[in-house]
Structures are given as structure tokens and as C-alpha cells.
């Protein structure tokens, strides 16, 4: 039998004591909330406020902490709010949406604690499209407005109609008179798929739409709704006198620059550069007027070959660039101050070896310790890292992963403490999550099964934990070789790896087994002198 001091020679035993009701805990991360798809309005995919997870401890002490069951597939990225006043206390909360039209508010640190769960109607059952089955409900990642305590989402119903909901993040109750039916001129909701993450900008919630399996007379749409009363305020059709032009973006939400301009990419369809804007990277005003665009010179042949340029969304990188990739594997860099129209990219090169009817996910961008990094995932190709020089991408990869996904690629996210301790997180089509050393890519730090993966899903990293949605669960991973608790809560939730016993004692008595259950375990502080240790 070993005590915790022997288990973790680097840990001070006082960290594990609960003495006179006071917990000695590890230092906490600075405030980090993940309230939108891919972390920020630039859609970098990087959480640069992660102070707990590092390449060193992920490589040695990382694993699954717990899993909560949900009632459907989780295509939307989980969102995270820390220190939320909910359930009679202050807690960290993860928000999870499913294709069954369920929304869950789970405790982000403890297994099985559901603060609320709402079902927003019977989901849609596609009959002729197998791209997303068996049902379609909440697909696009919601967005949270912390100032109003509101979560916005789109849900598709069995009738084919779609509704915009505004939910109170502490109760799940509808707000602002919602839900409202999503509609506009020419909009046939039954054939439109709300795939990209939602955007909240200047009191407007934006929703983007593509198609189900390219079926029917669909268009690409972006619709804007007032965030305080859910009234429609803006509507834009990508191909008003043509067809198609989906805004689906592999789930990526629109990007936004510092001037409030919106950036999206569009798929196959009609293009003329005046009214119809398929196969483009677009710069739009907040009122959804076209300000500028870039398009590949071979847009027509790409469109005819179902090589959607907009299979991913744009990522904004300093000082004034947007970057994206489509099915043809060409990585395209645009100057957002002068996008150049057809052939106007400042750089375009083939970043992968295998193209075809595949999906290119948006890059992840990170300013590392000595250079700027881009990480690129594309279906049927291994993930790669590239250097961004400040004005162009070095076309020779810095590193190439050994794992090659199928034609339905997972997503990438990155955690770092500013420019240090970068870890790249990848969800693979083999239902494994991989953690890479971002600076020394493709050095693999950790690999483990997540369950049954969902295509294009992105992990969420916040305050020492990684949250991943699957076909029927939300899984939580983190450091496993110490008892870890969030500060500032009345009860302590302790996590440890399986196969150990939690034992307690006071200053006078023997060690007594407190629980044989696997972690996490909730400890209620008392006024007695109580000490905890793990035994083997």
C-alpha cells in the first residue's frame, strides 16, 4: 500500500489534504470559457489560456475521467462555461446538443450530474439522404451570450421546419418569446441543413445553411435574427438567380475580423461574381452585403466535379489574411484587404497528396514559441503542420502524422498556455483521439478510444479537461494521476485512475476505505480534520 506522496513524488502531500474543511488544490487555469465554435471569432481552434495540460503531463498522466450518456449523435461542438451559478451552487458546466434535439447542461467536472435537459421536438428523419442519419436535429454548434445568459441554437423538426431557440443557460427555459420558425423568401427548410456553427455579432444571431446530399432546389443562405427578440433582420441567398452555393463549411462557423466583417466559404453552384457567389471565399458586411471575395481560377471545373471549395470555413490569421481549403486539397490564402476576386488568392498550393470527393477541414492556427503554425486535417490524408511566415505559408510541411483518416475526417483543436505548451488534439475516423506535441509535431503524446466517433466533430479543451461528443456519449478526459478539484466550490470532486481505493483518516484513527468506486468521487468538507490517500 502506498500513499499519495509515494504515488506522485513531485506532488506535495498537502495538496491532497482536506483539513478543517479547507482544500489544498492545484493551481487553476485563468478564466476560460468556450462559448462558440472553434473558440474565437477568428476560428483559430486554439485555446491559448490552458495552464494545466502540457505536453509533458499529457504524455504521462492523461486518460478518460468519465462519460455521460446522451440520446443521440453529437455533431455540435460541446460548449463550456465556468463558475456558473446553477443547481444551487457555482459550477463548471458543459452544454451538449444532440441530433435527437436534446440539449443537456452537465456538470463539467463530475459524472452524471445533469443540471437540466430539454427536448426541443421530434427530429427530422431523412428518407433519401444518408449523409446524416438516422435523424437530423441540432447539427450546428450553438453560441452562448454570457452577458444575457443565453444559448442560441437551430433545431430541425420532423415536419422539416427549423426553429431558432434562445435558452436560459441556468434553466434551459425558452427566452425572448422563442422559439421562432426560421424562414425567408424562397427558403425551403426541409431541404436545407443548418450545419455551420452559429455566429453572435453585434446583437445579431447568424445561421448558415447548405443542403441534404445536394438534393432539391437548394441555395446557400445566411439569416440574421435579433438576439433580444428573435425578430428576423437580415437575409442573404448566395445564388438568388441560380442554384446551390451551400454554406456548410464542415461545421465551421463564420469568421469575423476586427471591423465586424463576416467571412464564409461556399460550395458548388452558380457563380457570376455579381449576384451569384458559389465556390468563393466571401467577405460580407454585418448586414450581409458582399464587400469582396476570392475564388479559384478553376472554379467551374471544380464545381462540375463536386469539388466544393467551401467544404471547410475560413480562418483569420494576423495581420490581415484568411486561409481555407476545399475538397481539391489546395490551401488558399487571401488578403482580406484586397481579396482579388477570381484568381485573387495571394497563395494557393496543393497541401495534400490525395484529393477527390473528400472533405477538407479548416486549419488550426497557433502562434508558437518561435513561429506561427498551421495544422491541417483533410480526409484521406494525414494531418500536417506548416509554418506561416506572416505573409505566406511555407509549402514544405514541418511534420506529417502517421495516421491517415478515411473520407470522413474528424476535427482538430489546440490547447496552449499562450505561446507555450501547445498540444494538438485530433479526433480520428478510427474513433481514437490523438494528442500531439504541437511544436514537435507529429510526436504523439497520447492515443485513446473515444467510443463511436462522429465525423467532423471537434474536441473542446478547457481548464485541464478535454470534452468530446460521440454517437451517444459526451466523454471527459484529463490528468489521472492526482486528485484534482476545481477551487471555489462547496464540494470537492476528486478524480483518480481506476484500480485504487480512496481511504480516509483523522489525526487519531486508522485508515478506513472511503469508497471502492472509480472516480470521480464527491467529498463534502466537514469541520473535522480529515485526510485522504489512495491505496493500490
Residue ranges of each PLM-predicted region?
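Bacterial N-terminal signal peptides
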Residues: 15-25
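Inter-blade linker and blade-boundary elements of WD-repeat/beta-propeller domains
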Residues: 343-355, 397-402
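Subtilisin-like serine protease catalytic core
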Residues: 273, 390-394
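N-terminal secretory signal peptides that target proteins for export/translocation
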Residues: 1-12
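Sec/Tat signal peptide C-region and signal peptidase I cleavage site
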Residues: 26-31
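Short, composition-biased motifs enriched in small/polar/acidic residues
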Residues: 480-536
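Detector for outer-membrane/organellar transmembrane beta-barrel domains
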Residues: 380-385, 394-409
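Mobile, glycine-rich extracellular loop/lid and propeptide segments
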Residues: 32-286, 290-341, 360-367, 373-386, ...
